[in-house]
């Protein structure tokens, strides 16, 4: 279904096209999703704060304000907040569920600086910082002169030398922050028994990582070098539908072994690891049919407190993790409207370029096949050539198309009137009636926004 939704959104051909006939694909799925998305994003980003923490008591007011400021700063400044919301909501509207991943990431920040004319004391002070490393050094030595201009000597009779250093240093610092990223639907795995992420016995993030990235994450280098390359993720139905030929973002064939990509599963499993009979949540990294090990060769099975994934669904189905999307509600309408539109255009083509009936032996065929403005067709009798009349069915098709538009607006809550694009709504209608119609159309969108807020968005900021 997700592949079908993507193909419908991108207006891909159905495979039933006939050469010489209309091959148009209408865009009901895209219209519904792109029509609902601006309202949803505006609801969450219309104010200065995307999230506001409410104090439970008078003593909590200061901490609640601080939490509000911090979380909004992290979401909007440390991360691309609006872009994350856009892709999160769009995944949900298009592919049933949208998923984001929030986790703490430590990155090594490397900077280079150059210093000139440093004395020995200044150099020693600079290198007292353990994060500093000299990568290039040029030292000049010259004797110190006394007042008479002669070289000065110390108590041991050795000439006093002064050193000037020109150096290039490299500073390494670990920078940590909260990272929020969108997870493509095909990369997110969850148990079929799950109703929510929190109660699922198995959740995993399936992704392609280079050997270099795995080594930098602290996994055993020898094991990483022996992992088999894989590209199964590139051939999932959703990935094939999303990317055209040659657009795949992953490339397993490279001459540099460190840049070869491995299919890695970051798994969160509920299991009894200590033999006490109580399941706990553990994090396991899995690739090439083996559990990844740390630098010392020990399997990295770590007990964790939470699963870092947060999901939203626009039309949830009770007691199920996967609900419905707007694409599910409109994909059949797009097929029907595409069929009707194609037939209407084919009929219009035949009406404008009608076929000709000619009595054999009564008409010069060469004249008939040479279609020129004002041309002459030589015939032996006046009725030897006649035009085959094709009935125009467009007038009957337009009411059907309007009916389908009405069905779509009822299913999705998205219509030209709700978006302010239908001027006929304002004709001979009172202001109260217009407001009532707009509120009715916005009801479904507001419900989706409320569901988003109470599910994934709320859990993200906890």
What is each stretch, according to the model?
Residues 1-462:
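Extended alpha-helical, oligomerization-prone segments that build pores/tubes and scaffolds
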């Amino acid at each position: 279904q997700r592949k079908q939704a993507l193909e419908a959104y991108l207006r891909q051909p159905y495979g039933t096209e006939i050469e010489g006939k209309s091959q148009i694909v209408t865009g009901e799925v895209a219209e519904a999703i792109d029509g609902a998305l601006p309202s949803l994003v505006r609801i969450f980003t219309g104010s200065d704060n995307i999230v506001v923490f409410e104090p439970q008591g008078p003593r909590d007011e200061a901490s609640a304000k601080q939490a509000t400021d911090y979380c909004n700063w992290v979401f909007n400044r440390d991360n691309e907040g609006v872009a994350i919301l856009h892709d999160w909501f769009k995944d949900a509207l298009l592919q049933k569920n949208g998923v984001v991943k929030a986790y703490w990431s430590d990155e090594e920040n490397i900077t280079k600086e150059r210093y000139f004319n440093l004395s020995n004391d200044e150099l020693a002070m600079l290198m007292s910082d353990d994060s500093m490393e000299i990568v290039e050094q040029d030292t000049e030595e010259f004797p110190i002169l006394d007042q008479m201009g002669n070289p000065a000597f110390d108590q041991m009779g050795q000439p006093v030398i002064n050193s000037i250093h020109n150096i290039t240093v490299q500073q390494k610092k670990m920078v940590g922050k909260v990272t929020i990223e969108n997870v493509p639907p095909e990369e997110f795995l969850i148990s079929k028994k799950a109703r929510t992420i929190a109660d699922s016995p198995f959740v995993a993030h399936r992704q392609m990582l280079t050997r270099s990235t795995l080594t930098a994450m602290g996994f055993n280098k020898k094991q990483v070098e022996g992992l088999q390359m894989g590209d199964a993720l590139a051939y999932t139905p959703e990935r094939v539908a999303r990317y055209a030929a040659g657009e795949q973002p992953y490339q397993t064939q490279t001459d540099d072994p460190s840049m070869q990509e491995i299919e890695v599963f970051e798994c969160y499993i509920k299991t009894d690891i200590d033999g006490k009979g109580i399941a706990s949540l553990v994090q396991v990294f899995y690739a090439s049919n083996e559990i990844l090990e740390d630098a010392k060769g020990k399997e990295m099975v770590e007990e964790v407190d939470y699963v870092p994934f947060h999901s939203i669904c626009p039309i949830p189905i009770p007691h199920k993790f996967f609900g419905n999307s707007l694409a599910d509600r409109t994909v059949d309408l797009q097929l029907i409207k595409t069929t009707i539109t194609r037939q209407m255009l084919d009929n219009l083509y035949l009406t404008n370029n009608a076929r000709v009936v000619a009595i054999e032996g009564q008409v010069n065929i060469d004249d008939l096949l040479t279609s020129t403005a004002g041309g002459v067709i030589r015939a032996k009798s006046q009725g030897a050539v006649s035009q085959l009349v094709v009935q125009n069915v467009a007038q009957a098709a337009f009411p059907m198309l309007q009916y389908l538009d009405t069905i779509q607006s009822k299913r999705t809550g998205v219509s030209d009137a709700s978006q302010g694009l239908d001027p006929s709504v304002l004709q001979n209608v009172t202001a109260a009636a217009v407001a009532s119609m707009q509120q009715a159309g916005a009801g479904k969108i507001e419900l989706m926004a409320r569901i988003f807020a109470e599910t994934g968005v709320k859990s993200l900021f906890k």
